[in-house]
């Protein structure tokens, strides 16, 4: 509460009281029956005769004086004239001093009308009731009413008999109350702490009286923080409004009026977003209040008749991100830890960096140490939006490069994909090697190979190496038989993924992609549209997206050449199979004599099937109460063969066929 402006407000109300005393004296002098105990409850013949004998004259004229304090700031922001201020004070008085209720009841000649009417207010301001200039100050388009500072009630009554009222929030503000209007809780908030951002162009525009701006939000651009910083630099407080919650309110008109009233009262600019559909711009427009709107889409000219200043909220340069990390973390870093380097592959805006730094500091405090690279990456991951969880399966990576058993050429391509993700800020932003053609800043890849060759695990390893989560989308569940629904499902996924720092893996990509053939029927045409849409959306995606398919031959070359990295996963050869068996059987499980050479040479299995067989063998051994031996492993392989539809024969199982056949009886 700030009461510094109260002396001036009380002085202005005291001056109003003196005019009211004079008005009461004049009324008494003309009263035909001042001692009537029922005056104001009925009209007598004498009262009517007195009305016929006199004219309704204004009270004693007065000289308006300049307002100061909160009243003066409010008048300046809302563009109020001296007359507007006096009308506001007349309407405000009963909410500050209850005696004014009786004063107004007496002057209205109606004890039930305890607020100033329009006619009484004009006369107290020295104007006749028929004054066009005075009536104009009470018009819905007037500064007082358009800003929500004054409400005219009793619309069914004649204009002069309508009551004037000041909203409670305006009364509270003038009395020093800085709490947000209760009706706006959950919809709007006052931004006290502004994250530093490079808002030069927008700041200059707001200084130059630009009152509508639209920021197209890019991942990591921090449009919200950019708008707040520009408003603060331009001398405004910041009122942030959640566009989705505002739209969801049943009485949107009353709520937008409350937002504008709050902004005018605080001398605040409005930050509205993120918007996707038509926002209520007209209801939030005021000549003195800047409105900065932000959203992920391009500006639609139909949203407003007034063209806005258009600005792209581009991702922060690497140097700016490093400066923000250092400013937020201070000296609490572990030796040798570079926050910018540890989180270089995360696309974070200023506000996200501030929150991630707080999360990292809290985690380090709980762990009883200083902030490490892992704390930083965990803090950055905590800024992921939650919407993608409903559309994709989230995987917290638990594997690393050492867990991969792949040919060196394949591993090299995987490292290249991770390097692209790690250094894209430097290459695209600093070196300005943007690909053009409307492509985004993202990294795209294709993993092709038979089931079990390591495609999903490789995506998990890449995510782990970058400190990111893996989000898996099964495209077979996205495809819809109804025309256009598949594209809508994909758009929802990419829209939610834009707010997430993670690796997006589209599994079973052949459910959508296929050789583009001649269009023979509507099914062919729409199948081609779906595949083209997925590729186009991947190209404009700013994140990391990988397609995984079992059918490499089904993919059109025109598609694969537009992806950054294409990795073919072959079936493992004998040396790799031996390594896989050794790795999958593990070092902690008790192991008897297992013939790894035989397993590798006899059974041509992919890595996924080898792992499945090893796990099955471990369960068989645990159930038997002994170590993992050839009996358990061969039995597990036999089960894997049956799952794959293969015959269990002597050619593969050789001298261990008896163990495989014996497993059938288990």
Protein language model annotation of sequence segments:
Residues 1-63:
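Extended, charge-enriched "interface" segments that sit outside catalytic cores
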Residues 42, 46-77, 103-113, 158-239, ...:
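AAA+ P-loop ATPase motor domain of ring mechanoenzymes
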Residues 120-133:
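Short helix-coil junctions and helix-kink-helix linkers
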Residues 74-84, 132-133:
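Structural motif
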Residues 145-155:
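A short, conserved structural fragment
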Residues 256-284, 496-517:
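Conserved nucleotide-sensing/catalytic segment adjacent to the nucleotide-binding pocket
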Residues 141-142:
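Short, hydrophobic-biased segments on the C-terminal half of alpha helices
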């Amino acid at each position: 509460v700030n009461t510094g402006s109260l002396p001036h407000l009380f002085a202005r109300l005291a001056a109003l009281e003196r005019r009211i005393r004079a008005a009461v004296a004049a009324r008494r002098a003309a009263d035909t029956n001042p001692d009537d105990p029922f005056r104001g409850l009925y009209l007598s013949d004498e009262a009517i005769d007195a009305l016929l004998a006199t004219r309704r004259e204004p009270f004693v004229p007065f000289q308006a004086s300049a307002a100061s304090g909160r009243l003066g700031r409010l008048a300046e922001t809302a563009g109020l004239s001296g007359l507007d201020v006096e009308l506001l004070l007349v309407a405000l008085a009963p909410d500050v001093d209850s005696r004014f209720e009786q004063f107004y009841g007496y002057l209205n000649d109606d004890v039930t009308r305890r607020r100033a009417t329009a006619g009484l207010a004009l006369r107290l301001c020295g104007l006749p009731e028929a004054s066009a200039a005075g009536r104009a100050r009470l018009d819905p388009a007037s500064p007082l009413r358009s800003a929500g500072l004054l409400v005219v009630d009793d619309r069914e009554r004649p204009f002069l008999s309508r009551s004037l009222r000041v909203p409670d929030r305006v009364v509270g503000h003038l009395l020093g109350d800085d709490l947000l209007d209760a009706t706006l809780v959950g919809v709007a908030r006052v931004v006290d702490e502004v994250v530093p951002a490079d808002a030069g162009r927008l700041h200059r525009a707001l200084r130059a009286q630009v009152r509508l701006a639209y920021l197209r939000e890019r991942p990591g651009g921090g449009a919200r923080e950019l708008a707040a910083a520009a408003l603060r630099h331009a001398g405004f407080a910041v009122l942030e409004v959640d566009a989705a919650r505002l739209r969801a309110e049943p009485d949107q008109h009353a709520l937008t009026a409350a937002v504008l009233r709050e902004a005018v009262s605080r001398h605040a600019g409005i930050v509205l977003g993120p918007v996707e559909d038509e926002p209520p711009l007209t209801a939030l427009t005021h000549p003195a209040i800047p409105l900065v709107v932000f959203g992920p889409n391009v500006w639609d000219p139909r949203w407003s008749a007034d063209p806005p200043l258009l600005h792209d909220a581009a991702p922060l340069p690497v140097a700016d991100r490093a400066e923000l990390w250092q400013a937020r973390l201070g000296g609490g870093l572990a030796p040798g830890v570079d926050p910018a380097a540890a989180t270089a592959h995360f696309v974070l805006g200023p506000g996200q960096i501030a929150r991630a730094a707080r999360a990292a500091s809290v985690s380090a405090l709980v762990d009883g140490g200083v902030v490490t690279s892992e704390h930083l990456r965990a803090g950055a991951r905590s800024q992921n939006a939650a919407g993608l969880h409903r559309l994709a399966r989230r995987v917290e990576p638990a594997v690393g490069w050492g867990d991969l058993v792949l040919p060196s050429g394949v591993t090299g391509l995987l490292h290249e994909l991770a390097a692209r993700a790690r250094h894209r800020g430097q290459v695209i932003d600093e070196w300005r090697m943007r690909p053009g053609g409307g492509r985004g800043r993202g990294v795209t890849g294709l993993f092709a190979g038979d089931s079990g060759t390591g495609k999903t695990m490789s995506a998990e390893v890449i995510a782990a190496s970058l400190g990111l989560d893996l989000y898996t989308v099964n495209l077979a569940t996205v495809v819809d038989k109804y025309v256009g629904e598949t594209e809508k499902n994909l758009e929802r996924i990419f829209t939610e993924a834009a707010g997430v720092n993670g690796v997006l893996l589209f599994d079973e990509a052949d459910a959508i992609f296929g050789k583009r053939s001649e269009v023979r029927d509507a099914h062919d045409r729409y199948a081609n549209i779906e595949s083209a849409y997925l590729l186009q959306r991947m190209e404009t995606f700013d994140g990391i997206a990988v397609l995984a398919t079992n059918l490499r031959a089904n993919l059109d070359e025109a598609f694969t050449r537009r992806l950054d990295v294409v990795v073919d996963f072959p079936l493992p050869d004998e040396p790799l199979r031996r390594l896989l068996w050794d790795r999958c059987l593990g070092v902690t499980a008790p192991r008897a004599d297992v013939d790894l050479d035989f397993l590798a040479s006899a059974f041509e299995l992919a890595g996924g099937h080898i792992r499945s067989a090893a796990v099955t063998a471990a369960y068989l051994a645990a159930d038997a109460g002994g170590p993992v031996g050839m009996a358990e492993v061969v039995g597990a392989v036999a089960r894997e063969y049956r799952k794959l539809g293969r015959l269990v024969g002597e050619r593969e199982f050789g001298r261990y066929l008896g163990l495989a056949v014996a497993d059938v009886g288990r």
